[in-house]
Amino acid sequence: MAFRSAPRGDYLWVPDDRIWAIGSALMLLGSILFVGSLIGNPALPAPGADVVAKKPVHGVFHITRHPMMWGFALWAIVHALVAPYPASFAFTGGMLILALGGSAGQDKKKAALMGAAWADWSARTHFMPFGAQLSGKAPWKTAWPGLTLVLIGIIVWLGITYVHPM
């Protein structure tokens, strides 16, 4: 409600087709990360998370240790790019800070709660998306989360795109 009531302000740039295309691709990646984060995620508040953290890295966790939060961060960035006005920046900036700051805070909290299990998980995953691949810690083929997750991510992305007002 507060966002809708805030004075909009002028657009700082006109989002052209290139921005919309890049934004759509990033929204799709964010959707895939979000969907994948719901499967075998030791960061979720669940009993036995330490057992999950000891399992082999799988799916989107090869891309980042915090796929849900990076999905939210990508969504925030895209919304700022396609709606570049002050009220939008306040809203999406808050979402971005919450997503990335929350991820960093979650690393500290899980390290305290899970000890060696989280330390091991953190050593086998990377905070930054594609950080393991870019640093040479993991081969690029591990960045493919699997056909099922990609297809479900596409369905989620299409569904949200269909119902989302522009």
What are these regions (language model features)?
Residues 1-65, 70-166:
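Membrane-anchoring alpha-helices and their flanking helix-loop junctions
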